[in-house]
Structures are given as C-alpha cells and as structure tokens.
C-alpha cells in the first residue's frame, strides 16, 4: 500500500468513527431526555463525551478546508460541551443554553462542508439550517414559542450527516487532494 492509499483508508476510518460517535451522541442524548435522575445525568455525560469525539475527528477532517474555521468550530463545540458537563454535574448554572454553541458549531460545519470537495453540498445546507434552529435558543422566549419545530432542522441535519458518514464516509481521494492543496496532511 502506498502513502496515498494509507491516507485514504485513514480518513474514511476517521469519518466513519465520527459517524459512530455522532450516532452514540444522538442515541444517548435522546435517552437522557426520557430518563430521570442519575441515569439521565449519566446518559447526558456519555452523550457529551461522544460529542467531544465528533469534534476532534471533525477538526481533523475539515482542517484541509479551512484551518481557522475548523478550529473555531471545535472551540464552539468544546465550550458547549463544557457548559453541558458543568450544568449536568450542578457545578455551575448555564448562563446560556449550550445549544447556542452547538448552533454555531453546526453553522460552521455546514460552511466547511459547503467549501469542501469530499462531502455533498446538501449536507452543508442541512447542517447550516440545523445551526440556525439551535441558535433560536439565544432567546428562551423565542425558542419556547418555536419548540419543537426549531429543533427539527438540527435533528434532520445532524441525523443525515451521521447516516452519510456511517454509510459513505467521505470521498477520500477528494479529501487527499484538498489536503495536499492546503498543505495539511
């Protein structure tokens, strides 16, 4: 196997691993909504750890597209994860919903997908729309009026991206070309 083939296998593996973490995040997060007490808290913490995994893998995956935007997206996600953990463990009250930071994250990931050559553009549009839905949580009164409809774009965007990553991963040759052009390998 040559280096380009190794890199292609590696990026496909990373994309599928991100899909697995995303699926675990969705399943444990949804389960936390119906669970109570300690079980709900444990599921939410597991969900958040899975999202950190998605964040790290996405940072690596989208670095060739735009290193700065990929880093900014990762920062937004990590801030949202920290707020979630602190709130779940009752260590600090969340001054703002972590969904706001996840909204910024989804918007930036949508932008990065649109600029990439290795994922279909419709996924970028869905993720950006999902990010806008999560951003309605900036205003608690607005989000409560729009609920549950404001969550639908995020569920659709993140769910579709998850399935795509699990089934198709990424176009590894296109990823490799984009990473060679940007000087990121």
For each feature predicted by the language model, list its residue ranges.
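Hydrophobic, aromatic-enriched alpha-helical segments typical of multi-pass transmembrane helices
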Residues: 1-185
């Amino acid at each position: 196997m040559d280096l380009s083939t190794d890199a292609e296998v590696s990026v496909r593996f990373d994309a599928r691993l991100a899909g697995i973490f995303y699926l675990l995040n969705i399943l444990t997060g949804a389960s936390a909504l119906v669970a109570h007490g300690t079980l709900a808290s444990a599921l939410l913490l597991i969900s958040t750890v899975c999202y950190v995994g998605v964040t790290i893998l996405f940072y690596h995956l989208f670095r060739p597209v735009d290193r700065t935007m990929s880093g900014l997206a990762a920062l937004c996600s990590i801030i949202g994860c920290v707020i979630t953990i602190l709130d779940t463990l009752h260590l600090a009250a969340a001054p703002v919903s972590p969904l706001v930071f996840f909204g910024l994250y989804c918007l930036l990931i949508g932008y990065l997908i649109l600029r990439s050559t290795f994922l279909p553009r419709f996924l970028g549009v869905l993720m950006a729309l999902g990010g806008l839905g999560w951003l309605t949580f900036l205003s608690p009164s607005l989000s409560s009026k729009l609920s549950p409809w404001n969550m639908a774009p995020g569920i659709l965007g993140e769910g579709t991206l998850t399935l795509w990553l699990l089934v198709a991963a990424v176009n590894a040759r296109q990823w490799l070309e984009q990473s060679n052009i940007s000087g990121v390998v």
